[in-house]
């Protein structure tokens, strides 16, 4: 079923131009590039890697490759799964630029856009890296889905290059994932 649906997606997007694909990828799409990379890994068929690359949003990727943070105002949980896909593709293709883009994103979000509990957005969007006022003043706290996806990215990065990510892997689930579910 997974392969059939992937083939279906390849078929229905085959007539789209590169610009049309990039326009479509502005919307939240759940990290399809990662899924298609997984299908490539499962099947050994490189056509799925090409599909994964085609579903990679260049507006986010290209600045990350050159170490530029353009995240302010972006819908956070739309971007994180895209980056997970970049990392998955990088791992399968040994693409150092895409790997570095994922690492730069992680470092930027963790070290410049997150608060101590691990949250990194308010009202689902990245705040300015130099102004955390919205995170302190807004009644809506960080999204747990962002935190979950950042944990997934952390795990992927840690598996290929163990770093100082261990405190994030061990502490953030308790401060951001489990805490909102305590009804006492």
Model regions and ranges:
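Glycan-recognition and catalytic cores of secretory/periplasmic carbohydrate-active enzymes
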Residues: 1-184
């Amino acid at each position: 079923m997974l392969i059939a649906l992937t083939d279906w997606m390849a078929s229905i997007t085959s007539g789209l131009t590169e610009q049309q694909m990039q326009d479509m990828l502005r919307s939240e799409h759940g990290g399809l590039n990662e899924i298609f990379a997984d299908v490539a890994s499962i099947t050994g068929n490189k056509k799925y890697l090409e599909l994964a690359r085609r579903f990679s949003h260049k507006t986010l990727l290209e600045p990350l490759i050159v170490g530029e943070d353009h995240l302010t105002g972006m819908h956070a949980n739309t971007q994180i799964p895209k980056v997970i896909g970049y990392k998955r593709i990088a791992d399968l293709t040994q693409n150092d630029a895409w790997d570095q883009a994922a690492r730069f994103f992680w470092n930027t979000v963790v070290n410049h856009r997150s608060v101590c509990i691990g949250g990194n957005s308010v009202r689902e969007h990245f705040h300015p890296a130099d102004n955390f006022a919205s995170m302190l003043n807004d009644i809506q706290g960080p999204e747990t889905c962002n935190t979950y996806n950042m944990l997934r990215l952390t795990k992927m990065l840690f598996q290929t290059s163990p770093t100082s990510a261990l405190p994030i892997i061990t502490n953030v689930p308790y401060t951001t994932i489990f805490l909102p579910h305590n009804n006492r």
